[in-house]
Amino acid sequence: MKKQRLMIALLATLGMGSALASTSSEYNIANGLLPVEKDQSISVLKPFQGNFRILGSKIYHNDEQAKFSPIDYAVSWGLFAQPEIARHISVKQYDRYLNWKIAKLPVPAEQAMQMVSNMHIIPANPEIAQQIKQVKRGDLVYLKGDLVEIKDKDLVWKSSLTPTDTGDGACELFRVQSIHWVEKQNI
């Protein structure tokens, strides 16, 4: 019986290649734990919170940043968080980037760019690490935490601090301490 359990455990382990990697101490931050690797650190840049409409989410396992941020959220806020507008926004998330479009902008393009963003989500604790993966397109969530900078060996990953920037480096690197569902919508 003992050998059978060991064999089952061994087979389960062999079939979990990437899952095993994500449980190593290198992935502590992505699992909501404190960094223990000697070159890893998180620095708070400023507190951040708000209501955000989820336009999409993408889970990452294999990129360098997955050690810290296991999921990205495509979000809107303000006027663009209203369901009648948000349902018309289509998103494509890839390689930690976000492309979005809407057939008819209800505001000037410059203003619209300030109401949609890609957020790299870092869980502040193991409970949040589970909750952040439960969002669905259309959910309005209240997120509270900090915009941060991550350092790891040769990597410096720093959050944007302004909603007016676009392009590379314009995303929020958001360490989430709490998440509350304000409403669930199907958009």
Feature names for model-found ranges:
Residues 1-7:
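Bacterial N-terminal signal peptides that target proteins for export
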Residues 9-15:
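Bacterial N-terminal signal peptides
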Residues 3, 15-22:
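Sequence termini and other peripheral, non-core segments
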Residues 19-187:
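OB-fold and OB-like single-stranded nucleic-acid-recognition modules
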